[in-house]
Amino acid sequence: MIKLENIHKRFGETEVLKGIDLDIKQGEIIVIIGSSGTGKSTLLRTVNFLEQADEGRITIDDISVDTQKHTKAEVLALRRRTGFVFQNYALFAHMNARQNIAEGLVTVRGWKKADALKRAQQILDDIGLGDKGDSYPAALSGGQQQRVGIGRAMALQPELLLFDEPTSALDPEWVGEVLSLMKKLANQHQTMLVVTHEMQFAKEVANRVIFMAEGNIVEQGSPQDIFDNPQDPRLKKFLNQVGIE
């Protein structure tokens, strides 16, 4: 069980998150939608302390961390239960694909390098990049780089995978391969919290869709509830703006 309680975050005088509460069940795929600047990515980044919330509590299984009073060890334990997929891939340019995936196993999990590289190759095979292990990021397409980024997060076998707009930096021709991999993970019952503008993905894959506006969760429900029977005027306006009527 994953639980966010009363999460607040301010940047200067601007309150970006206004007391978010969210429970996530094991194996659940939750997609967060909403206009830019509504706090979606900030919420995602507070889950594993890439951004430290000003107030609130985050619980993943047996680890519960107060965002105001905590130790480095508690934060590290929380992070070890999550994997983060960045919008801009965030691969190490001086490492090949295999090394990028293996790095976390060595530095976070304490694996021997040879074992980590072997596991990394297995993951590359699994994500359809088995022949790209020796390739450096500059030699990979955007879609391939993002799949390596997902593979790196998968390698740690996290309780929760966090996706921050994983397709928004991609050329259109590479979006499909990344979404296909995410669907594969969903079918394997990987718990996922996804911020995306890919409405079709939300419709097809999410167990629950959350609409955020002005730092709050305004409406949430099944894809059918959100897309076919929206209640809040702000959600109706947003769906109209993105071409869903």
Please state what every model-predicted region is:
Residues 136-140, 144:
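Conserved ABC ATPase signature
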Residues 95-103:
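Short coil-to-helix segment of the ABC ATPase nucleotide-binding domain corresponding to the Q-loop/switch region
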